[in-house]
């Protein structure tokens, strides 16, 4: 295991932030994520915010798993250099999408995939990803949660 991340989202607070006038929260999701959550919301007869909150937890959990992996990879006493800050993290380029069986997956843009490989000292191979990303997302009542594990 390279890194493990977990995040919990308060769904009502997230929904309030998502619906505030002038908010940019929706810009942190790809069009595919927004489309999928709208479809899932219709199918489940519930609020779209529930499904977006779970995906937001997934993005946060991925970031935490990646940071944990970078910290573990650093040499003893070495300064840890993270590729992004919270201000320039490319949230929209980390997608949490369901596959054809409804199983959530983390989909990284090629730029983010390259940064992950570089930051962890993994081979740069655009065709064959040298690591796996496992994700589990859930929501129950007012809470959405996600766990992400990076592994070789």
Curated annotation (Swiss-Prot):
Function summary: Transfers the 4'-phosphopantetheine moiety from coenzyme A to a Ser of acyl-carrier-protein.
Cofactor dependence: Mg(2+)
EC assignment: 2.7.8.7
Catalytic activity: apo-[ACP] + CoA = holo-[ACP] + adenosine 3',5'-bisphosphate + H(+)
Broad class of where this protein is predominantly found: cytoplasm
One Pfam short name: ACPS
Compartments where located: Cytoplasm
GO CC, alphabetical: cytoplasm
Gene Ontology biological-process annotations: fatty acid biosynthetic process
Residues reported to bind Mg(2+): 7, 60
Species annotation: Bifidobacterium adolescentis (strain ATCC 15703 / DSM 20083 / NCTC 11814 / E194a)
GO MF annotation, one: holo-[acyl-carrier-protein] synthase activity
Family classification: Belongs to the P-Pant transferase superfamily. AcpS family.
Name the UniProt record assigns to this protein: Holo-[acyl-carrier-protein] synthase
Keyword Lipid metabolism found: yes
UniProt keyword list: Cytoplasm, Fatty acid biosynthesis, Fatty acid metabolism, Lipid biosynthesis, Lipid metabolism, Magnesium, Metal-binding, Transferase
